Every structure is written in structure tokens, then in C-alpha cells.
Amino acid sequence: MAIQRPADARPVAAHAFRGFNGLVGHEVVAWRPGFVEMSLKVRPELCNANGLLHGGVLMTLLDSASGFACTFNDTATARRLSVTLAFTTQFIKAARDGDVLGILGAWRPSTSQSTFAAETEIYDQKGDLVATGAGTFRYLKGERSDGMLSFLDQKAAD
């Protein structure tokens, strides 16, 4: 897939997700229509009995990035609602406690007004590919506030 960060992706101020995503602890780093970049520092409580990042956490990161990539709102205070219809994941390399993961999500063109597709990739701090995902999603009516999500001034982010 090799998703690239677009030059116009806007930096996002640190904030806390609500619900399950808040428990996982990933953050939005940059966002624009059709693209999101997230990050996660792997913690012991996210690892399985083998000391590796649990596959369910990887799937959550892939799913979350897919949804964000396709539900952009330029105010950053609310985004469209969506649900996952189908998702395929490929685990490529293990991640461990202390690893810092970069998660990239990208929207893929669709002929439908109610559904969309997205692809996602997770990389470790060395730039090695950890996992990939591809899914189909359905837009719901309305928007939801993500609380304090806000864009940073580009100069402040540099």
C-alpha cells in the first residue's frame, strides 16, 4: 500500500479519546480529508502473555485510523459518524512494550454515497511495517464531537 503523508496534513493538538479508544491510548498526530496519522506508545497492559502487542489492539488501531481518514471535519471539533462493515488485517511484524507506532490511514475512492473504503498501515519506530488493514465502512447520519480535538498552528508544529 505504502501510504504517504500528504504535505497538507494538519497537525492536531494532543487530546484524550473517550471510551475504548481512550483505554488504548492512541493519538491523532495529523489529519486532512482522506488521510490521518496517529501514534501509540506500546504499554505493558496492551501486550499479550508472550509480551507482544495484542493483535486486537493492532486491529483497533487500523480500524480507528480508517474511520478517521474518512470522516474529516475541517473544524476538528466534530466528525461524521461511521461503522465498520468488513475489515481485513495482515500481521507482519510483532510490536513490543516501549515501541512507538505510527498509524497511517487513507480513504479510497468509492462510487457510493453511504459507504467508503480505507486502507491503513502501522509502522514501528524503525520504519518497519508491523500490520496492514483494509476495510469497508458505512456513513451514519449526524456528527459527533470529539471534545478537545483541535488543529495546531502550522508554525507551532514545526
Predicted regions and their residues:
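Terminal targeting signals and extreme-terminal segments of soluble enzymes
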Residues: M1-I103, W107-D158
